[in-house]
């Protein structure tokens, strides 16, 4: 039987697709809607930069939950100031407990 010539990096590329799709959505927001709405984020780095970095570092699932928590904190009664993406995911975070990925109040403990 003939052995097929499958791409050796196909599995790795397939696993990167969700991450690239999430980062692509953020890129699209930054270059279309954000200039129309205006730049007025309460945090540094901005929420879109935070989301791009979180998804790039932790993947779409964990980084997406971190970004959602950040977006919910970025409102008039929310937090403000310097709020970087954590270097590692929170200790109690699991894929089946996604809300534990986000920091829902406060900035950089």
From Swiss-Prot:
<dbReference type="InterPro" id="IPR002696">
    <property type="entry name" value="Membr_insert_effic_factor_YidD"/>
</dbReference>
<comment type="function">
    <text>Could be involved in insertion of integral membrane proteins into the membrane.</text>
</comment>
<protein>
    <recommendedName>
        <fullName>Putative membrane protein insertion efficiency factor</fullName>
    </recommendedName>
</protein>
<dbReference type="GO" id="GO:0005886">
    <property type="term" value="C:plasma membrane"/>
</dbReference>
<keyword id="KW-1003">Cell membrane</keyword>
<keyword id="KW-0472">Membrane</keyword>
<comment type="similarity">
    <text>Belongs to the UPF0161 family.</text>
</comment>
<keyword id="KW-0997">Cell inner membrane</keyword>
<dbReference type="Pfam" id="PF01809">
    <property type="entry name" value="YidD"/>
</dbReference>
């Amino acid at each position: 039987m003939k052995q097929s010539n499958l791409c050796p990096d196909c599995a790795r590329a397939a696993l990167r697709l969700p991450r690239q799709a999430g980062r692509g959505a953020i890129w699209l927001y930054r270059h279309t809607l954000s200039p129309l709405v205006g730049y007025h984020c309460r945090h540094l780095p901005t929420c879109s930069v935070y989301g791009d970095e979180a998804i790039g570092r932790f993947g779409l699932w964990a980084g997406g939950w971190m970004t959602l928590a950040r977006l919910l904190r970025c409102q008039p009664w929310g937090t403000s100031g310097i709020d970087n993406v954590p270097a590692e995911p929170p200790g109690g975070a699991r894929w089946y407990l996604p809300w534990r990925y986000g920091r829902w109040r406060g900035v950089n403990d």
